[in-house]
From Swiss-Prot:
The lineage of its organism: Archaea, Thermoproteota, Thermoprotei, Thermoproteales, Thermoproteaceae. The keyword Transport does not apply. Keywords: Ribonucleoprotein, Ribosomal protein. This is Small ribosomal subunit protein eS1. It comes from Pyrobaculum neutrophilum (strain DSM 2338 / JCM 9278 / NBRC 100436 / V24Sta) (Thermoproteus neutrophilus). SMART domains: Ribosomal_S3Ae (SM01397). GO terms for biological process: translation.
Length: 222
């Protein structure tokens, strides 16, 4: 009798899923990492929690701060843990919108780009693109000198900070202000921005957490 009831329940479940795939899905609330305030980022549907793991969520910094000046800053987070209907994330990257970057470079100025790989004191390895815009046109030698100064200041800041402190300074603009001070010693600057961040490698304990969660969900689903 019990076997018959199970078979009937299974048939009903299959019938529902054929009629409406959304019927079996649940809504999960995705949260920012604690070092970025732990605020709710989005609501996402999934039939199984396993299908959420390692999914990337992209939002504007404006969605977190409600500050209109933060609209051009895109943030990427990766889901690495699910607890009930709550999905926790880790930072994956940042990028300024193309329109905003284009608006920074004006006639009669020079653009100086620097790409630097840094490591925080808690083991996060990130590739960071810095954009500096000068007040007037400058030559190749000055561009190289600004690039070197900015790269050195950026590497020092990262190595002295954990990822939470570092990202907080990026998002608040204080890191860009420090890099501005470093670069203007070579030539007058109009603007310095952290244009892009990509996480190249997470600390071992961060990776192990994600691997354990994926493995646990695979076992639960089998």
């Amino acid at each position: 009798m019990a076997e018959k009831q199970k078979a009937v329940a299974k048939q009903e479940k299959v019938a529902i899923s054929k009629r409406d795939p959304w019927a079996l899905k649940k809504w999960y609330t995705v949260y920012a990492p604690s070092y970025l305030g732990g605020v709710a980022l989005a609501e996402v549907p999934a039939a199984e929690a396993q299908k959420l793991l390692l999914r990337t969520i992209e939002v504007s910094l404006y969605d977190i701060t409600k500050d209109i000046s933060h609209l051009p800053i895109k943030l990427r987070f990766q889901i690495h843990r699910v607890d009930g209907l709550k999905a926790a994330t880790r930072f994956k990257g940042l990028e300024l919108t193309r329109d905003y970057v284009r608006s920074l470079v004006r006639k009669g100025t020079s653009k100086v780009s620097a790409i630097v790989d840094v490591k925080t004191k808690d083991g996060w390895v990130m590739r960071i693109s810095i954009l500096a815009v000068t007040a007037h046109r400058i030559g190749t030698a000055q561009k190289s000198a600004i690039r070197k100064r900015v790269a050195e200041a950026l590497s020092r800041k990262a190595s002295d900070s954990d990822v939470g402190q570092f990202l907080k300074e990026v998002l608040e603009g204080s890191l860009a202000a420090e890099l501005f001070v470093a670069g203007k010693k070579i030539a007058p600057l109009r603007k310095v921005e952290v244009a892009k961040i990509k996480v190249l490698r997470y600390p071992p304990e961060e990776e192990q957490t994600a691997v354990r969660e994926v493995a646990a969900e695979e076992v639960a689903a089998s």
